Amino acid sequence: MRGNGALLLDVPNRGRPISQSLFNSPRNVLVPLGSFDQGTGFLQDAGYTVAAVSWELGHGVELPTFKDAEGTTRYIEGTAFAIIRDVADFLSSASTDTVGTRNPLAGAISRTVALGYSQTGRFLKSFLVRGYNSVEGRRLFSGVHILGAASGHINLRSIPGPESGAGTIPTFDNPEVRGVNEEPLAISDVLEQVNSLGQIAPRMIFVNTTTDYFSLRASLGRTGGSGSEDKPLPPNVRMYDIAGASHVLLPGMVPGTGQCKLPYAILDWHPIMRSTLIALDRWLSTNISPPPNELMPLWEAAADAMALRAPNYLPKAIIQIPIRDQDGNANGGVRLPDMVAPLGTHGGQNPPLSFTCSLGSSYSAFAKTKEEREAANDSRLSLMERYKDRSDYVNRIRTAARDLEQRGFLLTEDVAIISHAAAEVTTLK
């Protein structure tokens, strides 16, 4: 397979490359973060060139330090911004480096896309607002694809020193952590700051999950740190909310005693990652616009909503969460077929809202019959009340999948996979 001219620069999350997991994971068989297992082979079959930047193992770490005015030893922070910039610039445009090492991709790259997930999505926004996406007046990344990082930046404030590369985030146990949810928060304000530097902002796609709104304050990426009205997204940005999706998928893992109360989320959101990457690349290479923004409607989180509250240092911030239907499923957004014809409630919060539970969210299956749900005091309609039989269910899944394909949110191969999975459901006859 010849390369398609696109370089995907994978910014690893806490040392773990993300690209194979996000884009090559088969349905219900997650390629782990950090793995170079090709999984479905989607990226390779499409001709993408993937480069991940990470530490070379076995050499130890000698971190540069300096002494501040008070004589305290401080660590030099933010060096990864320059590293990512220089590696991407070398691979995308240089013939050799400064000591004559040949660029293996010389002449093969026409566009460069940065990939970020959660922490490294926040890293990429910080990368942009600090002006690193320009080299000698040239724009470096023409595209940026970010999952799960609508609000906030990389944390270089709360933990100075060796551990800041991993960094902490605000949690339900520690909501006042500084350095992450800092202005500019709204995506429009992030891009405005890039423009103020005299730089041309890249074309960007942001993908959010339901969990991001409950556990990571994603609504601030739409409103900023004040008020509840969405700020208009710039024309070079698309934002897609995946209804019912969790921030992380933990297939095969069962919450243990004293851990999460509910089973982990199971909604497979990888098909949306694949389709939106194709849409972004098409936008860059042919100027064909991606599908319009698809956002979930929000309302202010009540005190008992199991949502991460606004920090005290943002007194005007209003945390908003997706509006749910009578089944507990989020309304609006990009609705995968498993949300259009659900077998349960996807993306619910998962007590006790520890780090893993709050990001893995939950799945709660519907009862099979009316008698079973009434015995369990479950107000949600049972499967037998929702669907005539398995054929009815499968037809609804297929119709929803074809609709998403027509709108640009599913690839043809994923339509077939989703439809086949529906036909194998055993809880309906």
Predicted features along the sequence, with ranges:
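C-terminal His-loop and adjacent cap/lid subdomain of alpha/beta-hydrolase
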Residues: M1-K429
